[in-house]
Amino acid sequence: MLLSKKTSIKVSREYANLIGHMCYAASKLWNVCNYERQHYKETGMEQYPDWYYQKKAHKEELWYKQLPSQTAQEVCKLLDKAWKSFYALKRSGGIETPRPPRFKQESIPITYMQMGIVHERDTDRVRLSLPKTLKKYMEETYQIHENFLYLENKIFRGMDQIKQLRIYPPEKGNCKIIVVYEIPDQEELPQNGHELSIDLGLHNLMTCYDSGNGKTFILGRKYLALERYFHKEIARVQAQWYGQQSGKGVKYLATSKHIRKLYKRKHDSVTDYLHKVTRYLAEYCREQGITCVVAGDIRNIRREKDLGHRTNQKFHSLPYNGIYIMLEYKLKRYGIRFIKQEESYTSQCSPLSPKVEKRYAEPSKRKERGLYRDGNRTYNADAVGAYNILRKYHSVSGVKRELSVTGLKTPEIIKVAV
Protein backbone atom coordinates (compact mmCIF):
# COMPACT_ATOMS: atom_id res chain seq x y z
CA MET A 1 0.00 0.00 0.00
CA LEU A 2 1.25 3.47 -0.91
CA LEU A 3 1.09 6.29 1.64
CA SER A 4 2.30 9.88 1.55
CA LYS A 5 3.61 12.38 4.07
CA LYS A 6 4.03 16.11 3.64
CA THR A 7 6.51 18.27 5.52
CA SER A 8 8.79 21.28 5.17
CA ILE A 9 12.57 21.20 5.48
CA LYS A 10 15.25 23.87 5.73
CA VAL A 11 17.71 24.02 2.86
CA SER A 12 21.01 25.85 2.44
CA ARG A 13 21.52 28.63 -0.10
CA GLU A 14 23.32 26.21 -2.43
CA TYR A 15 20.57 23.60 -2.21
CA ALA A 16 17.87 26.27 -2.69
CA ASN A 17 19.68 27.37 -5.85
CA LEU A 18 19.89 23.81 -7.17
CA ILE A 19 16.26 22.97 -6.42
CA GLY A 20 15.04 26.32 -7.71
CA HIS A 21 16.90 25.84 -10.98
CA MET A 22 15.41 22.36 -11.50
CA CYS A 23 11.90 23.65 -10.75
CA TYR A 24 12.46 26.45 -13.27
CA ALA A 25 13.72 23.97 -15.88
CA ALA A 26 10.64 21.80 -15.27
CA SER A 27 8.32 24.74 -15.99
CA LYS A 28 10.19 25.51 -19.23
CA LEU A 29 10.03 21.86 -20.32
CA TRP A 30 6.29 21.88 -19.61
CA ASN A 31 5.82 24.99 -21.75
CA VAL A 32 7.88 23.60 -24.65
CA CYS A 33 5.89 20.35 -24.71
CA ASN A 34 2.60 22.19 -24.21
CA TYR A 35 3.29 24.53 -27.14
CA GLU A 36 4.16 21.52 -29.28
CA ARG A 37 0.81 19.89 -28.47
CA GLN A 38 -1.20 23.05 -29.11
CA HIS A 39 0.48 23.88 -32.44
CA TYR A 40 1.58 20.51 -33.81
CA LYS A 41 -0.27 21.08 -37.11
CA GLU A 42 1.22 24.55 -37.65
CA THR A 43 4.71 23.22 -36.97
CA GLY A 44 4.31 20.58 -39.69
CA MET A 45 4.29 17.50 -37.46
CA GLU A 46 2.89 14.37 -39.06
CA GLN A 47 1.31 12.97 -35.89
CA TYR A 48 0.06 14.21 -32.53
CA PRO A 49 2.96 14.42 -30.01
CA ASP A 50 1.96 12.09 -27.18
CA TRP A 51 3.99 11.27 -24.08
CA TYR A 52 6.01 8.51 -25.76
CA TYR A 53 7.04 10.83 -28.57
CA GLN A 54 7.87 13.84 -26.38
CA LYS A 55 10.04 12.03 -23.84
CA LYS A 56 12.25 10.84 -26.73
CA ALA A 57 12.14 13.92 -28.96
CA HIS A 58 13.26 16.35 -26.24
CA LYS A 59 15.87 14.09 -24.70
CA GLU A 60 18.82 16.14 -25.98
CA GLU A 61 17.31 19.58 -25.37
CA LEU A 62 18.52 22.05 -22.73
CA TRP A 63 15.63 21.99 -20.25
CA TYR A 64 15.29 18.21 -20.40
CA LYS A 65 19.00 17.71 -19.66
CA GLN A 66 18.81 20.09 -16.67
CA LEU A 67 16.63 17.51 -14.91
CA PRO A 68 17.15 13.88 -13.88
CA SER A 69 15.90 11.67 -16.71
CA GLN A 70 12.92 10.20 -14.86
CA THR A 71 11.99 13.62 -13.43
CA ALA A 72 11.87 15.08 -16.95
CA GLN A 73 9.76 12.13 -18.12
CA GLU A 74 7.38 12.73 -15.21
CA VAL A 75 6.88 16.36 -16.32
CA CYS A 76 5.90 15.11 -19.79
CA LYS A 77 3.64 12.49 -18.22
CA LEU A 78 1.79 15.03 -16.05
CA LEU A 79 1.22 17.20 -19.12
CA ASP A 80 -0.09 14.14 -20.97
CA LYS A 81 -2.59 13.46 -18.16
CA ALA A 82 -3.71 17.10 -18.25
CA TRP A 83 -4.41 16.90 -21.99
CA LYS A 84 -6.25 13.59 -21.64
CA SER A 85 -8.40 15.18 -18.94
CA PHE A 86 -9.11 18.13 -21.25
CA TYR A 87 -10.20 15.86 -24.11
CA ALA A 88 -12.38 13.75 -21.79
CA LEU A 89 -14.08 16.90 -20.47
CA LYS A 90 -14.62 18.16 -24.00
CA ARG A 91 -16.26 14.87 -25.05
CA SER A 92 -18.48 14.69 -21.97
CA GLY A 93 -19.79 18.24 -22.35
CA GLY A 94 -19.44 18.88 -18.61
CA ILE A 95 -18.17 22.39 -19.43
CA GLU A 96 -19.34 24.20 -22.55
CA THR A 97 -15.93 25.54 -23.59
CA PRO A 98 -13.15 23.83 -21.58
CA ARG A 99 -9.70 25.37 -21.85
CA PRO A 100 -6.58 23.33 -22.62
CA PRO A 101 -3.71 23.08 -20.10
CA ARG A 102 -2.11 26.48 -19.52
CA PHE A 103 1.48 27.55 -19.82
CA LYS A 104 3.40 27.85 -16.55
CA GLN A 105 4.39 31.39 -15.58
CA GLU A 106 6.36 30.31 -12.50
CA SER A 107 8.50 27.39 -11.38
CA ILE A 108 6.67 24.12 -10.76
CA PRO A 109 7.34 21.18 -8.39
CA ILE A 110 9.64 18.38 -9.50
CA THR A 111 9.21 14.67 -8.79
CA TYR A 112 12.11 12.31 -8.05
CA MET A 113 11.28 8.72 -8.88
CA GLN A 114 12.59 5.66 -7.03
CA MET A 115 15.67 5.19 -9.22
CA GLY A 116 16.98 8.64 -8.33
CA ILE A 117 16.55 8.21 -4.55
CA VAL A 118 19.01 6.47 -2.22
CA HIS A 119 17.81 5.91 1.34
CA GLU A 120 19.35 3.68 3.98
CA ARG A 121 16.89 2.02 6.31
CA ASP A 122 16.38 3.64 9.75
CA THR A 123 18.19 6.83 8.75
CA ASP A 124 16.75 10.32 8.42
CA ARG A 125 18.63 11.25 5.24
CA VAL A 126 18.03 10.65 1.54
CA ARG A 127 20.43 11.20 -1.34
CA LEU A 128 19.11 12.51 -4.64
CA SER A 129 20.96 12.32 -7.94
CA LEU A 130 21.81 15.40 -10.01
CA PRO A 131 22.20 15.45 -13.83
CA LYS A 132 25.67 16.07 -15.27
CA THR A 133 24.56 19.09 -17.29
CA LEU A 134 23.14 20.79 -14.20
CA LYS A 135 26.26 20.08 -12.10
CA LYS A 136 28.50 21.55 -14.79
CA TYR A 137 26.34 24.65 -15.15
CA MET A 138 26.23 25.23 -11.37
CA GLU A 139 30.01 24.89 -11.06
CA GLU A 140 30.69 27.37 -13.86
CA THR A 141 28.01 29.91 -12.96
CA TYR A 142 27.62 29.81 -9.17
CA GLN A 143 30.71 27.88 -8.02
CA ILE A 144 28.45 25.26 -6.45
CA HIS A 145 30.31 21.95 -6.32
CA GLU A 146 27.62 19.43 -5.34
CA ASN A 147 27.51 15.92 -6.76
CA PHE A 148 24.34 14.93 -4.89
CA LEU A 149 21.43 16.54 -3.09
CA TYR A 150 21.08 15.44 0.54
CA LEU A 151 17.82 16.02 2.41
CA GLU A 152 17.41 15.31 6.13
CA ASN A 153 14.17 14.95 8.06
CA LYS A 154 12.89 12.62 10.77
CA ILE A 155 9.98 11.41 8.61
CA PHE A 156 12.44 9.42 6.47
CA ARG A 157 13.47 7.26 9.44
CA GLY A 158 10.44 4.97 9.43
CA MET A 159 10.29 4.45 5.67
CA ASP A 160 11.61 1.32 3.99
CA GLN A 161 10.76 1.93 0.33
CA ILE A 162 10.46 5.51 -0.91
CA LYS A 163 8.69 5.49 -4.28
CA GLN A 164 8.51 9.21 -5.05
CA LEU A 165 9.74 12.49 -3.63
CA ARG A 166 7.94 15.62 -4.77
CA ILE A 167 9.87 18.84 -4.13
CA TYR A 168 8.31 22.30 -4.35
CA PRO A 169 10.18 25.52 -5.21
CA PRO A 170 12.04 26.87 -2.13
CA GLU A 171 10.66 29.88 -0.26
CA LYS A 172 12.68 31.82 2.32
CA GLY A 173 15.06 28.94 2.98
CA ASN A 174 12.29 26.36 3.38
CA CYS A 175 11.21 23.71 0.93
CA LYS A 176 7.95 21.75 1.04
CA ILE A 177 8.22 18.07 0.13
CA ILE A 178 5.77 15.19 -0.28
CA VAL A 179 7.13 11.68 0.22
CA VAL A 180 5.33 8.68 -1.28
CA TYR A 181 6.38 5.40 0.34
CA GLU A 182 5.23 1.81 0.40
CA ILE A 183 4.22 -0.32 3.37
CA PRO A 184 3.18 -4.00 3.39
CA ASP A 185 -0.51 -4.62 2.73
CA GLN A 186 -2.51 -5.60 5.80
CA GLU A 187 -4.60 -8.73 5.34
CA GLU A 188 -8.32 -8.02 5.66
CA LEU A 189 -9.82 -9.18 8.95
CA PRO A 190 -12.44 -11.96 8.89
CA GLN A 191 -15.94 -10.54 9.20
CA ASN A 192 -17.36 -10.96 12.72
CA GLY A 193 -20.66 -9.10 12.22
CA HIS A 194 -19.49 -6.02 14.14
CA GLU A 195 -20.06 -3.05 11.81
CA LEU A 196 -20.14 0.73 11.86
CA SER A 197 -22.21 2.93 9.55
CA ILE A 198 -21.61 6.61 8.75
CA ASP A 199 -24.01 9.29 7.58
CA LEU A 200 -22.20 12.33 6.14
CA GLY A 201 -23.69 15.78 6.59
CA LEU A 202 -22.96 19.48 6.99
CA HIS A 203 -23.72 20.41 10.60
CA ASN A 204 -22.85 16.91 11.79
CA LEU A 205 -20.00 15.91 9.49
CA MET A 206 -20.12 12.21 10.44
CA THR A 207 -22.93 10.58 12.41
CA CYS A 208 -21.92 7.01 13.28
CA TYR A 209 -23.89 3.96 14.38
CA ASP A 210 -22.13 1.03 16.09
CA SER A 211 -23.99 -2.24 15.48
CA GLY A 212 -22.24 -3.95 18.38
CA ASN A 213 -23.71 -1.88 21.21
CA GLY A 214 -26.30 0.26 19.40
CA LYS A 215 -24.33 3.39 20.26
CA THR A 216 -24.47 6.50 18.06
CA PHE A 217 -22.01 9.38 18.13
CA ILE A 218 -21.24 12.49 16.11
CA LEU A 219 -17.83 13.56 14.81
CA GLY A 220 -16.71 16.71 13.00
CA ARG A 221 -18.91 19.45 14.48
CA LYS A 222 -16.06 21.96 14.08
CA TYR A 223 -15.82 21.52 10.30
CA LEU A 224 -18.56 24.02 9.48
CA ALA A 225 -17.16 26.52 12.01
CA LEU A 226 -13.76 26.37 10.28
CA GLU A 227 -15.36 26.91 6.88
CA ARG A 228 -17.45 29.83 8.16
CA TYR A 229 -14.49 31.55 9.82
CA PHE A 230 -12.28 31.47 6.73
CA HIS A 231 -15.10 32.46 4.34
CA LYS A 232 -15.82 35.55 6.47
CA GLU A 233 -12.15 36.44 6.83
CA ILE A 234 -11.50 36.06 3.09
CA ALA A 235 -14.58 38.17 2.28
CA ARG A 236 -13.43 40.89 4.71
CA VAL A 237 -9.91 41.10 3.26
CA GLN A 238 -11.21 40.95 -0.32
CA ALA A 239 -13.60 43.85 0.32
CA GLN A 240 -10.76 46.00 1.70
CA TRP A 241 -8.31 45.09 -1.06
CA TYR A 242 -10.76 45.48 -3.95
CA GLY A 243 -11.99 48.76 -2.47
CA GLN A 244 -8.44 50.11 -2.42
CA GLN A 245 -7.89 49.11 -6.05
CA SER A 246 -11.21 50.58 -7.19
CA GLY A 247 -10.37 53.84 -5.43
CA LYS A 248 -7.15 54.05 -7.44
CA GLY A 249 -9.02 53.46 -10.69
CA VAL A 250 -7.72 49.93 -11.33
CA LYS A 251 -9.82 48.42 -14.11
CA TYR A 252 -8.98 44.73 -13.63
CA LEU A 253 -8.97 43.87 -9.91
CA ALA A 254 -6.21 41.49 -8.83
CA THR A 255 -5.87 39.28 -5.77
CA SER A 256 -3.22 39.77 -3.08
CA LYS A 257 -0.67 37.69 -1.18
CA HIS A 258 -2.79 38.03 1.97
CA ILE A 259 -5.83 36.52 0.24
CA ARG A 260 -3.77 33.69 -1.25
CA LYS A 261 -2.34 32.93 2.20
CA LEU A 262 -5.86 32.82 3.67
CA TYR A 263 -6.97 30.32 1.03
CA LYS A 264 -3.92 28.20 1.79
CA ARG A 265 -4.57 28.38 5.55
CA LYS A 266 -8.19 27.38 4.97
CA HIS A 267 -7.18 24.38 2.86
CA ASP A 268 -4.51 23.27 5.35
CA SER A 269 -6.76 23.74 8.40
CA VAL A 270 -9.68 21.80 6.91
CA THR A 271 -7.42 18.99 5.64
CA ASP A 272 -5.71 18.72 9.04
CA TYR A 273 -9.07 18.55 10.83
CA LEU A 274 -10.41 15.87 8.48
CA HIS A 275 -7.28 13.80 9.07
CA LYS A 276 -7.80 14.05 12.85
CA VAL A 277 -11.47 13.08 12.61
CA THR A 278 -10.86 10.10 10.31
CA ARG A 279 -7.89 8.98 12.44
CA TYR A 280 -10.11 9.01 15.55
CA LEU A 281 -12.70 6.89 13.74
CA ALA A 282 -10.11 4.38 12.52
CA GLU A 283 -8.68 4.03 16.04
CA TYR A 284 -12.18 3.59 17.48
CA CYS A 285 -12.90 0.78 15.01
CA ARG A 286 -9.61 -0.94 15.84
CA GLU A 287 -10.20 -0.75 19.60
CA GLN A 288 -13.83 -1.94 19.38
CA GLY A 289 -13.06 -4.86 17.05
CA ILE A 290 -15.12 -3.51 14.15
CA THR A 291 -14.36 -5.31 10.87
CA CYS A 292 -16.55 -3.40 8.39
CA VAL A 293 -17.37 0.31 7.96
CA VAL A 294 -20.28 1.33 5.71
CA ALA A 295 -20.47 4.99 4.64
CA GLY A 296 -23.37 6.61 2.83
CA ASP A 297 -22.43 7.42 -0.77
CA ILE A 298 -23.38 11.05 -1.46
CA ARG A 299 -21.54 11.44 -4.76
CA ASN A 300 -23.60 13.41 -7.33
CA ILE A 301 -26.00 14.50 -4.58
CA ARG A 302 -25.33 18.15 -5.48
CA ARG A 303 -26.10 17.74 -9.17
CA GLU A 304 -28.89 19.96 -10.55
CA LYS A 305 -29.86 21.25 -7.09
CA ASP A 306 -30.23 24.85 -5.98
CA LEU A 307 -30.64 25.19 -2.22
CA GLY A 308 -29.89 28.90 -1.97
CA HIS A 309 -26.51 30.62 -2.19
CA ARG A 310 -25.58 30.01 1.46
CA THR A 311 -26.41 26.31 1.53
CA ASN A 312 -24.91 25.88 -1.94
CA GLN A 313 -21.62 27.32 -0.69
CA LYS A 314 -21.56 24.92 2.27
CA PHE A 315 -22.71 21.95 0.20
CA HIS A 316 -20.31 22.44 -2.70
CA SER A 317 -17.30 22.90 -0.41
CA LEU A 318 -17.97 19.62 1.43
CA PRO A 319 -14.90 17.43 0.64
CA TYR A 320 -16.76 14.12 0.74
CA ASN A 321 -14.43 12.39 -1.71
CA GLY A 322 -11.43 13.38 0.40
CA ILE A 323 -13.18 11.94 3.47
CA TYR A 324 -13.77 8.64 1.63
CA ILE A 325 -10.10 8.43 0.61
CA MET A 326 -8.84 9.21 4.12
CA LEU A 327 -11.18 6.68 5.71
CA GLU A 328 -10.38 3.95 3.21
CA TYR A 329 -6.60 4.01 3.56
CA LYS A 330 -6.64 4.50 7.36
CA LEU A 331 -9.03 1.58 7.83
CA LYS A 332 -7.10 -0.54 5.33
CA ARG A 333 -4.00 -0.26 7.53
CA TYR A 334 -5.91 -2.18 10.22
CA GLY A 335 -7.46 -4.68 7.81
CA ILE A 336 -10.94 -3.15 8.16
CA ARG A 337 -13.24 -3.30 5.14
CA PHE A 338 -14.64 0.01 3.84
CA ILE A 339 -17.81 0.14 1.73
CA LYS A 340 -19.76 3.02 0.16
CA GLN A 341 -23.50 2.37 0.20
CA GLU A 342 -26.13 4.22 -1.87
CA GLU A 343 -28.31 6.03 0.68
CA SER A 344 -31.60 7.03 -0.99
CA TYR A 345 -34.58 7.26 1.43
CA THR A 346 -32.39 6.47 4.46
CA SER A 347 -33.27 9.80 6.12
CA GLN A 348 -37.02 9.46 5.36
CA CYS A 349 -37.75 5.88 6.43
CA SER A 350 -38.53 5.07 10.03
CA PRO A 351 -35.99 2.86 11.84
CA LEU A 352 -38.96 0.56 12.60
CA SER A 353 -40.09 0.25 8.95
CA PRO A 354 -39.82 -3.23 7.35
CA LYS A 355 -37.38 -2.02 4.66
CA VAL A 356 -35.53 1.09 3.54
CA GLU A 357 -37.16 1.89 0.22
CA LYS A 358 -39.45 4.42 -1.47
CA ARG A 359 -42.81 2.95 -0.39
CA TYR A 360 -41.87 3.27 3.30
CA ALA A 361 -40.40 6.78 2.98
CA GLU A 362 -42.30 9.46 4.92
CA PRO A 363 -40.57 12.87 4.63
CA SER A 364 -43.22 14.49 6.86
CA LYS A 365 -41.89 12.58 9.88
CA ARG A 366 -38.67 14.58 9.74
CA LYS A 367 -40.09 17.53 11.67
CA GLU A 368 -36.91 19.58 11.98
CA ARG A 369 -33.33 19.35 10.78
CA GLY A 370 -32.30 17.15 13.72
CA LEU A 371 -35.63 15.61 14.76
CA TYR A 372 -37.38 12.52 13.41
CA ARG A 373 -40.77 11.68 14.99
CA ASP A 374 -42.51 8.33 14.46
CA GLY A 375 -45.75 8.34 16.44
CA ASN A 376 -44.81 8.84 20.09
CA ARG A 377 -41.17 8.00 19.45
CA THR A 378 -38.55 10.65 18.68
CA TYR A 379 -35.10 10.05 17.25
CA ASN A 380 -32.14 12.08 16.11
CA ALA A 381 -32.60 12.46 12.33
CA ASP A 382 -28.91 11.99 11.46
CA ALA A 383 -28.70 8.91 13.70
CA VAL A 384 -31.71 7.46 11.84
CA GLY A 385 -29.84 8.07 8.57
CA ALA A 386 -26.75 6.20 9.81
CA TYR A 387 -28.90 3.35 11.15
CA ASN A 388 -30.83 2.98 7.88
CA ILE A 389 -27.62 3.03 5.82
CA LEU A 390 -26.52 -0.12 7.64
CA ARG A 391 -29.98 -1.68 7.19
CA LYS A 392 -29.83 -0.93 3.46
CA TYR A 393 -26.37 -2.49 3.21
CA HIS A 394 -27.66 -5.63 4.94
CA SER A 395 -30.61 -5.76 2.52
CA VAL A 396 -28.37 -5.40 -0.54
CA SER A 397 -25.82 -7.96 0.68
CA GLY A 398 -28.48 -10.44 1.82
CA VAL A 399 -27.55 -10.31 5.52
CA LYS A 400 -30.23 -10.72 8.19
CA ARG A 401 -29.21 -9.20 11.49
CA GLU A 402 -31.09 -7.58 14.37
CA LEU A 403 -30.05 -4.02 15.16
CA SER A 404 -30.83 -2.00 18.28
CA VAL A 405 -32.59 1.40 18.03
CA THR A 406 -32.08 2.39 21.66
CA GLY A 407 -29.13 4.66 20.90
CA LEU A 408 -30.82 6.71 18.17
CA LYS A 409 -32.36 9.32 20.47
CA THR A 410 -29.36 11.17 21.86
CA PRO A 411 -26.07 10.60 20.04
CA GLU A 412 -22.88 11.39 21.92
CA ILE A 413 -20.92 14.36 20.53
CA ILE A 414 -17.21 13.58 20.26
CA LYS A 415 -14.93 16.63 20.24
CA VAL A 416 -11.74 16.29 18.24
CA ALA A 417 -9.05 18.93 18.76
CA VAL A 418 -8.77 21.44 15.91
What are these regions (language model features)?
Residues 26, 75-83, 259-266:
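Short amphipathic alpha-helical coiled-coil/interface segments
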Residues 33, 74-86, 383-393:
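Stable alpha-helical structural segments in soluble proteins, enriched in small hydrophobic residues
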Residues 34-37, 41, 83, 87-94, ...:
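Long, hydrophobic, amphipathic alpha-helical segments used as structural scaffolds
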Residues 8, 78, 127, 176-178, ...:
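Beta-strand secondary-structure signal
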